[in-house]
Amino acid sequence: MNISGKKIIIFGGTSGIGEAATKIMSEKGAAEIIAISRNPDKMTNVPENVTLEKIDVLDEEALKSFFKNQGEFDVLINCATGGTRAVGPFLKMDLEGYRSSFAKLWGYTNVVRYGTEYLANNGNIVLVSGSPARKCRPGQIAISSVGGAVEAFARGIASEIAPKRINIVSPGVIDTPMSLSLIHI
């Protein structure tokens, strides 16, 4: 994809995969990048064409206002986790922790719901899932369930938003702060 001159919005864009995407898009010539996080100050060495914004993907009113103020854009990337993930054996897991893991799904649906209206007709949405969506390892049932739901959501909404596109990126284990927190599963 040629991103030269494009306006790109990246939720979860200040750490991990999102931070890497922000910096790569900057290097590849994006005209403007808005990197969004609940804690944008954690990003260091912010490229010149990157603006940092503080928004929680679960705050629908903030999202509505943000997208309205931004106007049209070309690419929407969402890799915001939405919160914490429950880990460990499901039969011993606190069910509230399991339910809370779905904040990622609700954040993704909020961003797609409120952002698609402003996405250019030839625009693209990219959602980050993960390999546990298709191959669940012991202790990863919450991550697997959420990833599966995110992937099903993208497949389901694709025809509704056409000709705009929606794609899933589904990495394996990446050296990120979130992955490091899951090592002890």
Name these PLM-found stretches.
Residues 47-61:
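Rossmann-fold cofactor-recognition segment
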Residues 30-43:
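Conserved glycine-rich Rossmann-like NAD(P)H-binding loop of the short-chain dehydrogenase/reductase
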Residues 58-71:
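Conserved Rossmann-fold cofactor-binding substructure of NAD(P)-dependent oxidoreductases
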Residues 14, 21-23:
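N-terminal Rossmann NAD(P)H-binding glycine-rich loop of SDR-like oxidoreductase domains
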